[in-house]
């Protein structure tokens, strides 16, 4: 909805941002909080007041009697809260209060291979649900608001439904499930037996026994791909079972009792972390389309996060003490360090490596040293806004790693590479891959040069890192933003 006194295109131009429209023609839904239009109209008409300078606190001040819903974001299998960073930035850029946005880090984010098999490096459904309940209680205490909105990706969506089924529904305003394997990744008595991702498991059978697959009293929304989610496929190729019928269709994430939203062409990760997904999440939470698609810069962003590692090959979100994090500003064209390090810290028991104030348009290198792992040099785009979710894990060695030269890993954390859609170059060489359903978000390259610029082009995004000698147990990780 356009602000009073002008159209939305003019207003967006004033703010320097693009306009994001509806992703589904004719889709109408009642928002959890219809605040956006009223706030923007007031802001735009205030004499002499720059919209860009309004703080999120003023959203509450200008809407007496209305409550800004807290939103808790839950990541998927083997992931971390860091994946929600851009989504949170986009909410903030549309003047949602930072204090009402929180992303949970599941301590052991990877699911057990079988629910009944004890595994200290992975979590069961019961363990993950118990931690989610604790995080919800903590968030409610922090905000002083009884009911909140849950937004979950992948495995997190099923954990949210389990929490709601177990008595948590009274504390939730709405649940938004993005790319959740609602009916499993396979339905089988012979494959993935005991896995929480098997639709024949006791867990999913009981979860889907609820009328419509959802608890009463809580609006539930699903966001899914039309056919490009690797975990909602009729063939078991991505489960290591090519040619085996999974019993799951492209509509696997949908639930009969939910409002089901389908976004064409997006992959499994993009069901939660893409701009298209954000538009739907924001619309559900506020009742309005976001006004800004771009991420607004802060004058002086402050970064922080946690260093974690792996246990028995599975990632954890448990902080590590004694890790060293050095941060350097780098030349965006060469990856060369500019001056001395901007930050140098040894982590304490909680694994926190910050805080660090940065320039919003600078490129940085993070040098991460964790006992037992290669020194990891991480290069990524500038940070336009501050975040407490700039988490770091060291590179996990692979038996196929080279013994000499340099190793470069390119990661797209919030989406898979689509070789039929994306332009990808590493070191000036075009990278191709299998067409069809996007399924990989990590690319590896080797180089004989051990101290050279390594530019990576991903569509319009360009990041240049440096190669490091693997013989010195050093590797390069180039992390894409979008």
Please give the residue ranges for each predicted region.
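N-terminal secretory signal peptides
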Residues: 1-27, 34-44, 52-53
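Serine-dependent carboxylesterase/thioesterase catalytic core
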Residues: 71-77, 81-82, 86-90, 96-97, ...
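Beta-strand-rich domain onsets/edges
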Residues: 281-302, 311
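A short, amphipathic beta-strand motif
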Residues: 301-313, 405-417, 422
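Short, ordered, surface-exposed loop/turn motifs in non-cytosolic proteins
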Residues: 310-338, 416-436
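Short, acidic Ser/Thr/Gly-rich low-complexity loop/linker segments typical of extracellular
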Residues: 331-352, 463
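Structured interaction patches on ligand/partner-binding surfaces of diverse proteins
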Residues: 343-346, 369-402, 462-476
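Short Pro-Gly-centered beta-turn/loop motif in secreted/extracellular proteins
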Residues: 349-365, 371-372, 439-453, 468-472, ...
């Amino acid at each position: 909805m356009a602000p009073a006194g002008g159209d939305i295109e003019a207003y967006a131009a004033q703010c320097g941002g693009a306009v994001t429209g509806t992703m589904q023609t004719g889709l109408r839904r009642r928002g959890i909080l219809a605040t956006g239009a009223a706030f923007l109209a007031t802001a735009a008409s205030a004499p002499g007041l720059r919209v860009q300078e309004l703080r999120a606190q003023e959203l509450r001040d200008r809407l007496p009697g209305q409550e800004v819903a807290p939103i808790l974001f839950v990541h998927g299998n083997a992931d971390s809260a860091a994946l929600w960073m851009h989504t949170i930035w986009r909410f903030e850029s549309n003047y949602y209060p930072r204090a009402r946005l929180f992303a949970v880090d599941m301590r052991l984010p990877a699911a057990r291979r079988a629910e009944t098999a004890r595994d200290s490096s992975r979590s069961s459904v019961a363990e993950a649900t118990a931690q989610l309940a604790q995080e919800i209680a903590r968030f409610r205490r922090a905000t002083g608001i009884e009911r909140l909105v849950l937004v979950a990706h992948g495995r997190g969506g099923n954990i949210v439904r389990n929490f709601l089924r177990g008595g948590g529904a009274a504390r939730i305003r709405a649940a938004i499930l993005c790319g959740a394997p609602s009916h499993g990744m396979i339905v089988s008595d012979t494959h993935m037996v005991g896995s929480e991702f098997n639709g024949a498991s006791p867990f999913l059978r009981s979860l889907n026994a609820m009328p419509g697959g959802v608890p009463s009293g809580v609006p539930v929304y699903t966001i899914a791909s039309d056919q490009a989610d690797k975990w909602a496929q009729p063939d078991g190729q991505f489960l290591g079972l090519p040619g085996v019928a999974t019993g799951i269709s492209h509509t696997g994430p949908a639930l009969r009792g939910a409002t089901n939203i389908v976004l064409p062409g997006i992959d499994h990760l993009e069901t939660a972390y893409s701009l298209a997904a954000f538009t739907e999440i924001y619309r559900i939470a506020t009742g309005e389309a976001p006004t800004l698609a771009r991420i607004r810069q802060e004058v002086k962003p402050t970064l922080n996060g946690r260093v974690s590692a792996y246990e028995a090959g599975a990632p954890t979100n448990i902080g590590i003490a004694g890790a060293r994090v050095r941060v350097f500003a780098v030349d965006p064209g060469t990856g060369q360090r500019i001056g001395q390090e901007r930050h140098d810290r040894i982590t304490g028991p909680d694994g926190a490596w910050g805080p660090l104030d940065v320039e919003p348009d600078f490129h940085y290198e993070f040098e991460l040293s964790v006992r037992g792992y290669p020194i990891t040099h991480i290069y990524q785009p500038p940070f336009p806004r501050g975040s407490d979710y700039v988490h770091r894990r060291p590179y996990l060695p692979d038996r196929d790693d080279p013994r000499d030269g340099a190793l470069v890993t390119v990661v797209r954390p919030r989406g898979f590479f689509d070789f039929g859609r994306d332009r990808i170059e590493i070191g000036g060489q075009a990278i191709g891959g299998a067409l069809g359903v996007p399924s990989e978000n990590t690319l590896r390259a080797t180089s004989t040069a051990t101290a050279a610029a390594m530019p990576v082009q991903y569509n319009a995004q360009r990041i240049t890192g440096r190669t490091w000698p693997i013989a010195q147990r050093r590797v390069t990780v180039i992390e894409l933003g979008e």
